[in-house]
């Protein structure tokens, strides 16, 4: 059941135990201030991340794309080192950091680039950069890739 922001009076009383995800959508500066308040109120009881500049997510601790990919690879008998992932937002951070080949999109949030400076940046999503990269990788796996 959706809860509207004006119904949350005390962020310390957020119903974290029965919630799988809370999204706050709005102005990025407002959400950044809210993120600080939520960190102060919730501490390590929740995972906070931006999935877009205008969307702040509150998730259970340990609930992220990296953790999901870990479960999937274990189920399939694969290694994370053999996986490739592409991302553009802070909700991709754990996933990109856990795989053997992580790639940051050209349109990625600056915070993601700053937190994972060792990962290569490929082209913009609007130019189908993932498709271009994968085509290059499949056709010429040993040649370096140059976006766009």
From Swiss-Prot:
Gene3D superfamilies: 3.30.1240.10, HAD superfamily/HAD-like. It comes from the Bacteria. PANTHER family: HMP-PP PHOSPHATASE, PTHR47267. The keyword Magnesium applies. Belongs to the HAD-like hydrolase superfamily. Cof family. This is Putative HMP-PP phosphatase. It is an enzyme of class 3 (hydrolase). Catalyzes the hydrolysis of 4-amino-2-methyl-5-hydroxymethylpyrimidine pyrophosphate (HMP-PP) to 4-amino-2-methyl-5-hydroxymethylpyrimidine phosphate (HMP-P). It comes from Shigella dysenteriae serotype 1 (strain Sd197).
């Amino acid at each position: 059941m959706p809860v509207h922001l004006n119904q949350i009076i005390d962020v310390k009383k957020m119903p974290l135990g029965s919630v799988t995800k809370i999204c706050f959508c709005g102005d990025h500066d407002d959400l950044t201030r809210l993120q600080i308040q939520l960190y102060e109120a919730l501490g390590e009881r929740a995972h906070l991340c931006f999935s877009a500049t205008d969307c702040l997510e509150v998730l259970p601790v340990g609930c992220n794309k990296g953790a999901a990919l870990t479960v999937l690879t274990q189920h399939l008998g694969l290694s994370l080192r053999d996986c490739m992932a592409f991302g553009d937002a802070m909700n991709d951070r754990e996933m990109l950091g856990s795989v053997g080949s992580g790639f940051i999109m050209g349109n990625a949030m600056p915070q993601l680039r700053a937190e994972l400076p060792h990962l290569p940046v490929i082209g913009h999503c609007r130019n189908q950069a993932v498709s271009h990269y994968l085509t290059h990788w499949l056709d010429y796996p040993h040649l370096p890739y140059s976006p766009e």
